[in-house]
């Protein structure tokens, strides 16, 4: 919903989840009925269906087109949607929300540990996974997996669609953040099964939104950036749309950033205020927090349209009524770092897509949090004043796209959708190890799949008859810092001097994201191959994040080293140039008074000694030292020039007339 790659999950888990949707539609048509599209959101969910040549977003039994992703248990029943959310303040420990932040994660994940402290319901560790413990009727304690709670929400969406269509629904396209990893996707599919749904396809939220935007767009190629900031997750995807072909160029995001985090900041602000003003700590009072959470969300929404809102809560604690103003400026200040955090993935996706800002034709806003004026302003500023496109409904676009995808799979979309094709990308660079442990890249990250790349290698020892092919993925230059996917040997190479044999290595990623690697000795025609599949145990989101983060950290370290060397060179250059200037008769030697000369020479001598003693000082130290020396020398040089009628400070930099890097 890290930059280094198109998407955040494992190579080949299809980013759009729908590559070759069109080409496989025919074979799936037989077994699929009407396929609905479900946007299973962190805070709200939405369902749509393609009917009579267009998408219908279906209203629930309360008449609302979006349904809160909330589940609650009372002494007598289970509540889902509005009914659950509306009673949360009086039943906090038994009301479950934000379960999408738990699905497919491990209990030990730092995000889970953080969220545990913020929700009123109980999260426990079961087999290393977070489960929810809740009292159901008759005081019985029951433990639910995140998949089960998600299934309840999916079931509600299924019921909503069935009531509207008047028939049973078995199949659905369900969306996930582009940045969801394999475990999170698989868990979402499992939730579908528990809900009695065949999840015909998992597709990415920004890609689904791109379909909603681009379905009726004809005429010429367009680059669009989908900025999807929802209740709990954030995605950026850059796509090229050309008459029904949706090609993902790059994707990036954060699976733990969204409107819930903004609400939390408002809550923390008021908790502190209440403590200060009333000497009352409500941070452990679940009822008070439930009321405050509801009002924080309401205030946040209101501030998208007005500059000030009053947060009023009857009997918040000890019978005390609470009433405080919240301005838009304060809200923006409370969330400033989080809003700015959204720009990182935008920049990285742009770099990965290889596009200039001017080459983005449209910025499509998706997710309720994109209504926040500050978020829109940051995007506008980044894109040099370009206005985001507000043509799609940010709450409904994802379900809309999922419904279109459903119609392609079922064949019910007819001529209107038959030409739609989604093209996916390989999220991480793929390559092999060559001499010295070097990662030689064959398929760079964000390459559209399916793809095939070949490269010729040779032996590095005389009479070598076997080569070992080791396949890696990752962004680092050495294989020790990348992830080994598999290895195999090519035997029976004809003995020859090193560098003579020609061994062609071919990487092929098919539409399912399965990597085939083949090595062939061009001399003998002998070949070996290995198939690498996308197994569940492969890279987690955290590991991919770590690889890219490390690559970025190393790039940052390299930059710091260069800056330090530049600062040292600058100081040395100044000192030696100044030394020449004051010692050269044609320059200043004869124009300086004895006292001035002594002062300058002493400063230069001291600086050179300092340089000898501080070979590995920090950039700031070198800069500080340069300022010190300049403070002594420059005024004296300026004074000499003024006395001799030259331009004041004419060569006060000690005659530095170039800034070429020294060899």
Curated annotation (Swiss-Prot):
Gene Ontology terms: cellular component: cytoplasm; endoplasmic reticulum chaperone complex; endoplasmic reticulum lumen; membrane; nucleus
Motif Prevents secretion from ER in this chain: 660-663
Sites carrying sugar chains: 614
Assigned protein family: Belongs to the heat shock protein 70 family.
GO molecular function per UniProt: ATP binding; ATP hydrolysis activity; ATP-dependent protein folding chaperone; heat shock protein binding; protein folding chaperone
Pfam family, one: HSP70
Function per UniProt: Probably plays a role in facilitating the assembly of multimeric protein complexes inside the ER.
Composition skew (Acidic residues), residue ranges: 654-663
CDD domains for the chain: ASKHA_NBD_HSP70_BiP
GO biological process entries: chaperone cofactor-dependent protein refolding; endoplasmic reticulum unfolded protein response; ERAD pathway; protein refolding
Entry keyword annotation includes Transcription: no
Protein name, entry field: Luminal-binding protein 2
Gene name of the encoded protein: BIPE2
């Amino acid at each position: 919903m890290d930059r280094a790659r198109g998407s955040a999950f494992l190579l080949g888990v299809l980013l759009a989840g729908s590559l070759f949707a069109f080409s496989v539609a025919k074979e799936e048509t037989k077994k699929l009925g009407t396929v609905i599209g479900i946007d299973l959101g962190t805070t709200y969910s939405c369902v749509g269906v393609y009917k009579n040549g267009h998408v219908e977003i279906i209203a629930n039994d309360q008449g609302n087109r979006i349904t809160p992703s909330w589940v609650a248990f009372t002494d007598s029943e289970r509540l889902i949607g509005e009914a659950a959310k509306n009673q949360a303040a009086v039943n906090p420990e038994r009301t479950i929300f934000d379960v999408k932040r738990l699905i497919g994660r491990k209990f030990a994940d730092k995000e889970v540990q953080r969220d545990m402290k913020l929700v009123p319901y109980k999260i426990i560790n079961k087999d290393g996974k977070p489960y929810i413990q809740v009292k159901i009727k008759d005081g019985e304690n029951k433990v639910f997996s995140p998949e089960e709670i998600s299934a309840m929400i999916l079931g509600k969406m299924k019921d909503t669609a069935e009531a509207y269509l008047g028939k049973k629904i078995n199949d659905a396209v369900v969306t996930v953040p582009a940045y969801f990893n394999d475990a999170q996707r698989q868990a979402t599919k499992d939730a579908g099964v528990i809900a009695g749904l065949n999840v015909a396809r998992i597709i990415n939220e920004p890609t689904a939104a791109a379909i909603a935007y681009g379905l009726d767009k004809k005429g010429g190629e367009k680059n669009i950036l989908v900025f999807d900031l929802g209740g709990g997750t954030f995605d950026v995807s850059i796509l090229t749309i050309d008459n029904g072909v949706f090609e993902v160029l790059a994707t990036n995001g954060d699976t733990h950033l969204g409107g819930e985090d903004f609400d939390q900041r408002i809550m923390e602000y008021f908790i502190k205020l209440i403590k200060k003003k009333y000497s009352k700590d409500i941070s452990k009072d679940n009822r008070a927090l439930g009321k405050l959470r509801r009002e924080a969300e309401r205030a946040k929404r209101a501030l998208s349209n007005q500059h000030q809102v009053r947060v009023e809560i009857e009997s918040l604690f000890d019978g005390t009524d609470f009433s405080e103003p919240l301005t838009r400026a304060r809200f923006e200040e409370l969330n400033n770092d989080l809003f700015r955090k959204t720009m990182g993935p935008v920049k990285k996706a742009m770099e990965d897509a290889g596009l200039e800002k001017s080459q983005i034709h449209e910025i499509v806003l998706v997710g309720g949090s994109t209504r926040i004026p500050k978020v829109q302003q940051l995007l506008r500023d980044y894109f040099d004043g370009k206005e985001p496109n507000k043509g799609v409904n940010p709450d409904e676009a994802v379900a809309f796209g999922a419904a279109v995808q459903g119609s392609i799979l079922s064949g019910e979309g007819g001529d209107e959708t038959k030409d739609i094709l989604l093209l996916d990308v390989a999220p991480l660079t793929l390559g092999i190890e060559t001499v010295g442990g070097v990662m030689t890249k064959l398929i760079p990250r964000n390459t559209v799949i399916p793809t095939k790349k070949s490269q010729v290698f040779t032996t590095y020892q005389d009479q070598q008859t076997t080569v070992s092919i080791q396949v890696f993925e990752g962004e680092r230059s050495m294989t020790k810092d990348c992830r080994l996917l598999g290895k195999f040997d090519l035997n029976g190479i004809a003995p020859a001097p090193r560098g003579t044999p020609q061994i062609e290595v071919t990487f092929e990623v098919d539409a399912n994201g399965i990597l085939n690697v083949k090595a062939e000795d061009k001399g003998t025609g002998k070949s070996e191959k290995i198939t690498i599949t996308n197994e569940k145990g492969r890279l987690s989101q955290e590991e991919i994040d770590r690889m890219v983060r490390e690559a970025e950290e190393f790039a940052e370290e390299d930059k710091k080293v260069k800056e330090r060397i530049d600062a040292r060179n600058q100081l040395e250059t100044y000192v030696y140039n100044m030394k020449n200037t004051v010692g050269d008769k044609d320059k200043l030697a004869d124009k300086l008074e004895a006292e001035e000369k002594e002062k300058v020479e002493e400063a230069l001598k001291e600086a050179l000694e300092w340089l000898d003693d501080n070979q590995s000082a920090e950039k700031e130290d070198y800069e500080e030292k340069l300022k010190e020396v300049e403070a002594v020398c420059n005024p004296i040089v300026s004074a000499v020039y003024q006395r001799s009628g030259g331009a004041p400070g004419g060569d006060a930099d000690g005659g530095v007339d170039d800034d070429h890097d020294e060899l």
